[in-house]
Amino acid sequence: MNAIANLAATLRADLGECLADLAVDALIDEAELSPKPALVDRRGNGAHADLHLGLMQASALSLWPCFKEMADAAQRHGRIDARLRGVLGQLGRDGEAAMLRTTEGVNTHRGAIWALGLLVAAAALEPRRTQAGEVAARAGRIALLDDPAAAIGDSHGERVRRRYGVGGAREEARLGFPRAVRHGLPQLWRSREGGAGEQNARLDALLAIMSVLDDTCVLHRAGRVGLAAMQDGARAVLAAGGSASLAGRRRLCELDRRLLALNASPGGAADLLAACLFLDRLPAVSGGWAGSL
């Protein structure tokens, strides 16, 4: 019996490590993707005076233990209820504290901890069911539960949500990440099937999200004017053939210049792109552990 218990514990650890690896890889791949309009990438800081690519990479790596612990907690608990929600909330706050220690107080990935933490936990709950829509729907069920220990929010995102009447990251999660599942992922797959390279396919996925998302990061920095510039500009790139086409590339440069002039950085869309990359890879890597659980 001890050998069986030890094997089960090893398999659970492997699952948690794999999911944490996927989440961190998604964050790093999102950060390194270039050229992203007004976002930190290999070219520079975008619209952010306090961020750079190395900081984004270090921040992502600092979150590995947080994601691992979230996966382990979800697998141990085995069901979606208020107790699991409370545990995940505390782990998320601990992860945010670790991030802030790494970045010396700069908020690099607060929104990503929320989005990817939910998706990691959702994947760990039912490791044999890894299709994007199913995982996102489970994450939404977790997000619908309130965390009684959470502080009353007065973040930029919360203030923007109240001022402009938009849903923000909380609603996106509670709805099962529709901008990622219904817009980002389908565009990623279409661009790949159309012959675009992986980097261009990912850029197109980001643009698809930007075209429909009420991004609270953009609203905070540039209001409705900035949001319209982001959404209209992203649609124009895709309508011109996407980032892999010459016309689309020109439109992308125009969008980058416009958002930089407005100091508008689509950080919410970037978080959802990372969610897309996580969900996209999950079925391909799950075979190594799903069949053993």
Swiss-Prot record:
Disulfide bonds: none annotated. It catalyses: 3'-dephospho-CoA + ATP = 2'-(5''-triphospho-alpha-D-ribosyl)-3'-dephospho-CoA + adenine. This is Probable 2-(5''-triphosphoribosyl)-3'-dephosphocoenzyme-A synthase. Signal peptide: none annotated. Belongs to the CitG/MdcB family. The gene is mdcB. One of its GO terms (biological process) is prosthetic group biosynthetic process. Keywords: ATP-binding, Nucleotide-binding, Transferase. It is an enzyme of class 2 (transferase). Involved in the formation of 2-(5''-phosphoribosyl)-3'-dephosphocoenzyme-A, the prosthetic group of the acyl-carrier protein of the malonate decarboxylase. Its EC number is 2.4.2.52. The keyword Thylakoid does not apply. One of its GO terms (molecular function) is triphosphoribosyl-dephospho-CoA synthase activity. InterPro entries: CitG (IPR002736), TriPribosyl-deP-CoA_syn (IPR017555).
